[in-house]
């Protein structure tokens, strides 16, 4: 999991992500390049939101790489050029779309740290979805959730899998979540 997302670099061997249009060697990219080039996103076992930033800002942070390119690495943004403003508006629209999907539009301006735990989990997942990944890696997304929140998580993951056609690689102990979304299950002892 950590090698796949670039958190650790393998010492030997190769890792490829096969997509219909090309074969991407993950070993040659840094973690942020894996997200940008190979379209692999992840969440961590422990929530890694920016608690003092707003819910909306947390989703915009995920789109930082695209906005930096659109801004000419800050020049166009500083000059407030139309091309940058348009890209920025697209990023805001994408963030609002995902907030609507998880029912948090009304909390867009609240600090992410003020959300209930289950909502923070969903926010972290849709933050990863803001880069439009081909593969979403989730490390125990249901950890600490009650049964109602786990059911909401399953609904979100099914939407991501079916409607967004995003592959999901899941590490999880909650078997209702695993069996609710999985096509293939591998168990490690």
Model-identified regions with their sequence ranges:
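Helix-to-loop junction immediately C-terminal to a conserved catalytic motif
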Residues: 5
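ABC ATPase NBD coupling module
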Residues: 9, 22-47, 82-89
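Conserved catalytic loops of ABC-family nucleotide-binding domains
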Residues: 40, 156-170, 174, 180, ...
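Conserved ABC ATPase "signature" region
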Residues: 71-107, 155-159
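Hydrophobic anchor residue at the start of the ABC signature
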Residues: 125
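Conserved catalytic motifs of ABC-family nucleotide-binding domains
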Residues: 132
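Catalytic Walker B motif of ABC-type/P-loop ATPase nucleotide-binding domains
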Residues: 136-140
């Amino acid at each position: 999991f950590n090698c796949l997302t670039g958190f650790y670099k393998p010492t030997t061997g190769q890792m490829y992500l096969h997509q219909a249009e090309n074969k991407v060697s993950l070993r040659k990219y840094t973690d942020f390049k894996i997200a940008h080039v190979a379209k692999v996103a992840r969440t961590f076992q422990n929530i890694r939101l920016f608690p003092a930033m707003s819910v909306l800002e947390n989703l915009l942070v995920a789109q930082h790489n695209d906005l930096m390119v659109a801004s000419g690495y800050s020049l166009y943004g500083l000059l407030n050029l139309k091309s940058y403003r348009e890209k920025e508006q697209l990023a805001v629209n994408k963030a609002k779309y995902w907030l609507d999907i998880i029912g948090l539009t009304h909390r867009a301006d609240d600090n992410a740290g003020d959300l209930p735990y289950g909502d923070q989990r969903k926010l972290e997942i849709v933050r990863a979805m803001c880069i439009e990944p081909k593969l979403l890696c989730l490390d125990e997304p249901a950890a600490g959730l009650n049964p109602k929140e786990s059911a909401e998580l399953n609904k979100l993951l099914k939407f991501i899998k079916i409607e967004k056609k995003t592959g999901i690689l899941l590490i999880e102990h909650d078997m209702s979540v695993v069996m609710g979304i999985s096509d293939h299950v591998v168990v490690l002892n």
